[in-house]
Amino acid sequence: MSKLSLSSLDKTHLEGKKVLVRVDFNVPLNEDGQITDDTRIRAAIPTIEYLINHSAKVILAAHFGRPKGQVNEKMRLTPVAARLSELLGQNVALTNSCIGDEAIAQSNSLSNGDVLLLENVRFFGEEEKNDLEFAKKLASHADMYINDAFGAAHRAHASTQGVTNYLSPSVAGFLLEKELKYLQGAIDSPKRPLAAIVGGSKVSSKIGVLDSLLDKCDKIMIGGGMIFTFYKARGLDVGKSLVEEDKLKLAKDLEAKAKAKGVELLLPTDVVLADEFSPDANSKISRIDSISGNWMGLDIGPDSIKVFQNALAECKTIIWNGPMGVFEFDKFAEGTNAIATTLADLSAFSEVCTIIGGGDSVAAVEKAGLAEKMSHISTGGGASLELLEGKTLPGVAALNDA
């Protein structure tokens, strides 16, 4: 799906223009209201700086948290405006509301190169309902629209889809363009062999992805809590490990489909067991056919790590979505950390394209200090999953075609 992007617009298109940019500033805060991870803010900087340098008037729209259509003082974008001001080295004003006469007066008074952040669009319930009247009010701030919020592109909301009815051109920002290039590219025209590593605790949340990847991948490695549903489906004892009883048939069907399609589906052969779900639990390594009693699996074992590493060494494109174990507990983080290190090395030394597809895998890679070594780290959890499932993202579909 080829969409117009900011890179196709120059100063003649942008100078003096009021540009509404949808960004993803949904960042984590601590109890003191301070930002603990500004990755998403930094990810939007290239688009914002390009607009500043091309003398546009920049109006940013973002959501924060789930205020349920009401003003919530704890969900104001004040800390975001402060951090963005620091990163840009210039003042970023924040409106009291994203729509209304006062906000419009602020956007109308901008000079070329100024940046204005509209207050949390989700303070209005109309945002998530994709209400066109509300979208029209948002659009009235600007002459044109840029979507740079990949993390919200799978939502058909007023600020991601509705506004495109009233602003033209509507184009992709640099971040959105990069996300589509890597994720869409990995699915549509990857360098092969193509491998996917799929982890996480539940098969149910990854059904669509696994099903879609079976049509595209040469190898699929499965880790995380979901492996125990596959083992139970094979008739193995999994002790107290997490199992989705209603997904046993599905797990069997996925294994059968992989076999029929000639896709190499790798499941761990050994696991790290714990006697309780706790960072201080007693642990032991066990083959998958020797799990019993009150033990539960919380990570993949050392033999499985080696098998996965050997399989990955043959690949040219690797997509990773979901951790291999409970990486938040250091005792059960070895599988996830080993995969992260392997991907970083393959990316650095073998020119393998490594894509970290959002969510917990990103947190794991950042915790390991390896984010910079990957080819691409996706900023969207749900959005990257839906793209990998082959779904159309409403926020992308709404943009002007190239």
UniProtKB/Swiss-Prot annotation:
Keyword presence, Protein biosynthesis: no
Keywords for the protein's UniProt record, in alphabetical order: ATP-binding, Cytoplasm, Glycolysis, Kinase, Nucleotide-binding, Transferase
Entry-linked Pfam families: PGK
CDD domains in alphabetical order: Phosphoglycerate_kinase
Residues given in the record as ATP binding sites: 206, 297, 328, 358-361
GO cellular component: cytosol
Catalytic reaction annotation: (2R)-3-phosphoglycerate + ATP = (2R)-3-phospho-glyceroyl phosphate + ADP
Record flagged with keyword Kinase: yes
Protein's pathway: Carbohydrate degradation; glycolysis; pyruvate from D-glyceraldehyde 3-phosphate: step 2/5
SUPFAM superfamilies per UniProt: Phosphoglycerate kinase (SSF53748)
Stretches that traverse the bilayer: none
EC number: 2.7.2.3
Family: Belongs to the phosphoglycerate kinase family.
Self-association and partners: Monomer.
Name of the protein this chain belongs to: Phosphoglycerate kinase
Gene that this polypeptide is encoded by: pgk
